[in-house]
């Protein structure tokens, strides 16, 4: 009898782990994150859902978000958001979510004081919990169009046999190409299925919108890589750091997707305009 209950307990544990290892559970984690912000506070939401090594951006610099929010006081206002797109690796333990956010001074009945789009990268930690590794957003003044949630499931890739490039190498190569070629560098590195989140603009989701945003970029931006991480199967990953232009200093985030012809930029988040 004891053996039977031990086996039953093991089955239940395995079932829970596999239930959490899915795009639906990652999306639910994002929704729970947003719900906690609304019901409790933004501070409590970030402390609860961020990985202890998770990154947020403060005054253009990437910092440890767990330490920042643990030590900070509650901030006034109400921050709301919801995912409209989610993508996950084939191992179902690493992915990202994105969608609109709004900030209200007192109540949700008021007009929002600010709005924009967020990007959050998630992973399953050793306890089988979804925690976010990095969170970054942009703001804009345009009206947000409600979009139905879209989930991108993993696609089987037929990589070239000699493909050995790491995500770090891809990021470094793009930055070097940008130094020498400027905006033309995007033609070799940007995925045909990509999102550009630039401050002051709605996310660019189609070729025409992406070209318009890239053309709007100022020349001479200097990137410094501070960190990067890829999924266990090296299918998704991200690189982040700072970007400088004259006296302006901001953070940046790129999410990379490994496609049939190598690493391609799936999402780029910039605050320069």
Question: Can you say where each PLM-predicted feature lies in the sequence?
Answer:
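Intrinsic, low-complexity N-terminal interaction/targeting segments
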Residues: 61-63, 85, 200-209
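Short, structured motif recognition centered on aromatic/hydrophobic residues
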Residues: 33, 95-98, 119-122, 130, ...
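Bacterial Sec-dependent N-terminal signal peptides
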Residues: 1-25
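Short, low-complexity N-terminal intrinsically disordered segments enriched in polar/charged residues
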Residues: 18-43, 47-48, 131-133, 138-180, ...
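Short beta-strand edge/turn micro-motifs at domain boundaries
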Residues: 115-151, 251-273
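C-terminal functional regions that serve as terminal interaction/effector modules
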Residues: 21, 25, 183, 189, ...
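Surface-exposed, charged secondary-structure patches
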Residues: 70-109, 210-250
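Short, well-ordered alpha-helical segments enriched in acidic and aromatic residues
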Residues: 39-60, 180-199
């Amino acid at each position: 009898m004891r053996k039977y209950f031990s086996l039953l307990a093991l089955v239940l544990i395995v079932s829970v782990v596999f239930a959490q290892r899915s795009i639906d559970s990652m999306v639910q984690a994002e929704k729970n994150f947003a719900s906690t912000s609304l019901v409790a506070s933004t501070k409590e939401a970030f402390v609860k859902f961020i990985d202890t090594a998770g990154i947020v951006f403060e005054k253009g610099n990437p910092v440890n978000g767990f330490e920042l929010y643990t030590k900070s006081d509650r901030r006034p206002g109400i921050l709301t958001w919801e995912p409209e797109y989610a993508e996950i690796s084939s191992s179902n333990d690493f992915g990202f979510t994105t969608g609109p956010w709004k900030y209200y001074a007192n109540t949700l009945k008021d007009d929002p004081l600010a709005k924009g789009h967020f990007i959050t990268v998630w992973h399953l930690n050793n306890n089988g919990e979804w925690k976010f590794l990095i969170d970054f957003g942009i703001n804009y003044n345009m009206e947000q169009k409600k979009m139905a949630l879209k989930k991108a499931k993993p696609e089987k890739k037929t990589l070239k046999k000699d493909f050995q490039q790491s995500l770090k190498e891809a990021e470094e190569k793009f930055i070097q190409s940008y130094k020498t070629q400027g905006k033309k560098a995007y033609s070799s590195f940007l995925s045909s299925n990509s999102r550009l989140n630039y401050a002051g603009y709605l996310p660019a989701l189609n070729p025409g919108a992406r070209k318009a945003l890239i053309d709007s970029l100022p020349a001479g931006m200097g990137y410094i890589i501070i960190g990067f991480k890829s999924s266990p199967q090296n299918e998704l990953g991200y690189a982040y750091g700072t970007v400088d232009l004259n006296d302006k200093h901001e953070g940046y985030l790129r999410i990379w997707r490994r496609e049939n012809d190598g690493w391609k930029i799936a999402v780029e988040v910039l605050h320069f305009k």
